From Swiss-Prot:
It comes from Escherichia coli (strain K12). The keyword Membrane applies. This is Cyclic di-GMP phosphodiesterase PdeF. Residues 493-744 form the EAL domain. One of its GO terms (cellular component) is plasma membrane. GO terms for molecular function: cyclic-guanylate-specific phosphodiesterase activity; nucleotide binding; protein homodimerization activity. The gene is pdeF. Its cofactor is Mg(2+); Mn(2+). Phosphodiesterase (PDE) that catalyzes the hydrolysis of cyclic-di-GMP (c-di-GMP) to 5'-pGpG. Truncated proteins consisting of the GGDEF/EAL domains (residues 319-747) or of the EAL domain alone (481-747) have c-di-GMP phosphodiesterase activity. They do not have diguanylate cyclase activity. Cyclic-di-GMP is a second messenger which controls cell surface-associated traits in bacteria. InterPro entries: Cyclic-di-GMP_PDE-like, EAL_dom, EAL_sf, GGDEF_dom, MASE1.
Length: 747
């Protein structure tokens, strides 16, 4: 361990690995370098030392210079002598310093990342391939011309612009193009052998997921066959496949590999293939009168093929990485950063059996309205983190829209685990700005088998069962609660929602009216809404208004009723010039800030006076914003409309609410009026309500006046208005034209 720690400490020093690596690697590269003889002298076909020195400089920076100088002297001193070796060393050092400096200047950040990064392609092509090859050739030509490298004059020839120079230049470009990544890989492996494991892991990630072992084996077999053909010596039995035609076949084969297997594998494999091919060039390029030209063309093929293969490998790898990232992001909610419903569907598909849990948090809605959406985001994140220790591999918490979450569990002992999860949930504490918040969590679950074809329908059923869990304070099994009944109930809701939308679009609603008579002989009507069925039967509001409220259609229905009532009043202005109508409002409409503006616009459109409208409001816990509701009602009163509190005395409407309410009329709930004759307690309650209403200067309306005894009792209490079957039954709105006068006379 001490030896390893010491090695790690000194390996990047100038007297460590940088000092000895060039001396060790240059002799090996000397056997890989390939030379050819042409009419004008000797030329390079492949040259690696420059790529090694560029890689050393890029990796070790200034610490690489002593080792590079030492490596050149050790390798060339005996062959060239002191002065030529010194000149050659100066050439290399000038080149690599300029390349390294330019690259660092134009790529200041992350300049040493592994090769294959598309963001650095242009800088690396220029500073690590084109610029050093060009400068090396210029300095080499100059040194040979002035006599500093007299022994190497045969490598450059007398004239600088000839085929030999072009071949040398292409060889340097090819050597740098495939040699710099290769040398960089060798340096990293020598510096840290464990890098091989990391490299192999990255290599596997870059391979296309659809690649099979059989495909890869066939590809390697084809590649080996082409290499074997290139390495076979020419003879009288040789075919076209023993010529450089086979070299051209390498391109489509390597292109396929580049698109399928990734840059990490192809860059190394192509380097080996190209070095073997170039080293065996004499086997497929015969010597004949056009030998130099053919060698030049083949050398350019090495360069073009290398660039195409490497560039295609980089692009294909980058494209696969982008696609994988997009696919990964598609399964994660971008706000809460938890797996989404798509990820849940995939997990249910991959597992043969699963236990699906649903967590419903209804109290979160009010907290979000008061503290903002960040509370919900952090609550879900921390709740997911709280549940993570109880989850097995492959299980997860999934984000659902709104305030709910889902869990997928393995089926082993899922009943006991769900009970444990519920106990763990009850121990969860969430703090927001130092305040503890613990909304109740309802838990429902079911046992499902892959594939789950109707995930959204299933989640809707679990949501319904989770509401029962909030009441029972225990996890609820959907199968025991009757899945078929829940499915039918949910389908009926969806069907009713569609019918409501059709009714709004095609005016399939029907308005009825019930008279309300006053003690002084005045009469107004309450508008009652019905919906036409498929066979023109009338559907009562109890069947569709709860669905309308749940799916957010109640406000649209209210506006439909108001507009069609005003339209009726405008069309019959002559027959009923001062008649009033009472219209029921849903809690959603009352909580909308723009509702008074819309009412004002409709009144102006149909030229109806505001005092002719009475809006009946039921005070209930469905009022999501009580303050806004009070502002809306105040604006309606300022507009000239009257406000009536409906169904007073039951549920949410109580004496405590009466203290703060500001209305014009108070409608006593029919449950008190119905028994006012037979139940003295109901009589006293009604009397107290009337007394309080008079103190608030409100008129009182009695509902459910169904017989003469009730009517006499109501009159004795001094109630201002009466409504019920004794006064008049609900009739189509159009019939009110014929009922107004008889009702007034009877009153």
């Amino acid at each position: 361990m001490k030896l390893n720690a010491t090695y790690i400490k000194i390996r990047d020093k100038w007297w460590g690995l940088p000092l000895f690596l060039p001396s060790l690697i240059l002799p090996i590269f000397a056997h890989i370098n390939t030379f050819a003889h042409i009419s004008s002298g000797e030329v390079f076909l492949f040259y690696l030392p420059l790529a090694l020195m560029i890689s050393m400089m890029m990796f070790f920076s200034w610490a690489a210079l002593p080792g590079i100088a030492l490596g050149i002297f050790v390798r060339k001193y005996a062959e060239l002598g002191f002065y030529e070796t010194l000149s050659l060393t100066a050439n290399f050092i000038i080149i690599i310093i300029l390349c390294w400096g330019g690259y660092r200047v134009f790529t200041p950040r992350r300049n040493n990342v592994s090769h294959g990064d598309t963001r650095l392609i242009s800088q690396r092509i220029f500073w690590q391939i084109v610029f050093p090859a060009t400068l090396f050739l210029i300095l080499f030509q100059f040194a040979a011309f002035v006599g500093l490298l007299a022994s190497r004059e045969n490598l450059v020839g007398v004239m600088p612009f000839n085929l030999g120079t072009l071949i040398n230049y292409q060889a340097l470009l090819v050597g740098n193009l495939i040699g710099v990544p290769l040398c960089y890989f060798i340096i990293r492996v020598v510096r840290n052998p464990f890098y091989l494991r990391s490299y192999y892991s990255q290599l596997k990630q870059q391979v296309d997921a659809k690649v099979t072992k059989k495909e890869f084996a066939l590809w390697l077999l084809a590649l080996g066959a082409l290499l074997l053909l290139l390495c076979m010596p020419l003879n009288e039995k040789s075919t076209i496949f023993s010529t450089n035609y086979t070299l051209s076949l390498l391109l489509p084969l390597m292109m396929w590999g580049a698109m399928r297997y990734g840059y990490k594998l192809i860059s190394l494999l192509w380097a080996v293939v190209l070095m073997i091919s170039i080293h065996s060039y004499q086997n497929y390029i015969p010597i004949y009168p056009g030998y130099t030209t053919q060698l030049t063309i083949t050398s350019s093929s090495y360069l073009v093929f290398s660039f195409i293969v490497n560039y295609m490998a980089v692009l294909a790898t980058r494209q696969r990485a982008v696609v994988r990232r997009i696919q990964r992001l598609a399964y994660v909610d971008p706000v809460v950063h938890l797996p989404n419903v798509r990820a849940l569907n995939r997990a249910l598909r991959d597992a043969p059996w699963s236990a699906l849990c649903y967590l419903r948090i209804p109290g979160m809605e009010m907290l979000v309205k008061n503290y903002g959406i960040m509370l919900r985001i952090q609550y879900k994140q921390k709740l997911s983190h709280w549940l993570s220790p109880l989850l097995e591999p492959g299980e997860d918490v999934y984000q659902l829209s709104g305030n709910d979450l889902a869990l997928r569990l393995n089926t082993e002992s899922h009943q006991e685990r769900i009970t444990a999860l519920d106990s763990h949930l009850k121990q969860f504490r969430f703090f927001w700005d130092g305040m503890p918040m613990q909304p109740q969590i309802g838990v429902s679950y079911c046992y499902v088998r892959s594939p789950v074809n109707h995930i959204y329908l299933l989640l809707g059923e679990l949501n319904t069962v989770a509401e029962l869990s909030i009441v029972t304070n225990a996890p609820e099994n959907m199968q025991r609660r009757g899945a078929m009944y829940l499915q039918r109930e949910l389908k009926d809701k969806v069907a009713m929602m569609n019918r409501l939308q059709q009714a709004l679009e095609h005016n399939h609603f029907f308005l009825m009216a019930q008279p309300i008579t006053g003690m002084r002989g005045d009469v107004y009507h309450e508008i009652l809404l019905r919906m036409k069925g498929e066979n023109d039967e009338l559907i009562s509001p109890d069947s569709f208004l709860p669905v309308a409220h749940e799916f957010g259609l109640s406000s649209s229905i209210d506006m439909w009723v108001i507009e069609h009532t005003l339209q009726f009043m405008a069309e019959n202005r002559a027959k009923m010039p001062a008649h009033r109508f009472a219209i029921n409002l849903s809690p959603t409409s009352v909580c909308q800030a723009r509702f008074p503006v819309e009412v004002s616009q409709l009144l102006a459109k149909y030229q109806i006076e505001a005092w002719q409208l009475i809006f009946e409001v039921t005070e209930s816990n469905a009022l999501t914003n009580v303050k806004q509701a009070q502002i809306t009602l105040q604006h309606l009163q300022e507009l000239g409309c009257q406000i009536a509190i409906d169904d007073f005395g039951t549920g949410y409407a109580s004496y405590a609410r009466l203290k703060n309410v500001n209305a014009d009329l108070l409608k006593i709930d029919g449950s008190f009026i119905r028994n006012i004759v037979s139940n003295s307690l109901d009589y006293q309650i009604v009397a107290s309500i009337c007394h309080l209403a008079r103190m608030k200067k409100m008129l009182v309306v009695a509902e459910y006046v169904e017989n003469e005894e009730i009517r006499e009792a109501v009159l004795s209490l001094g109630i201002d208005y009466m409504q019920g079957y004794l006064i008049g039954k609900p009739q189509p709105l159009i019939d009110t034209l014929n009922e107004i006068e008889p009702i007034r006379e009877s009153a």
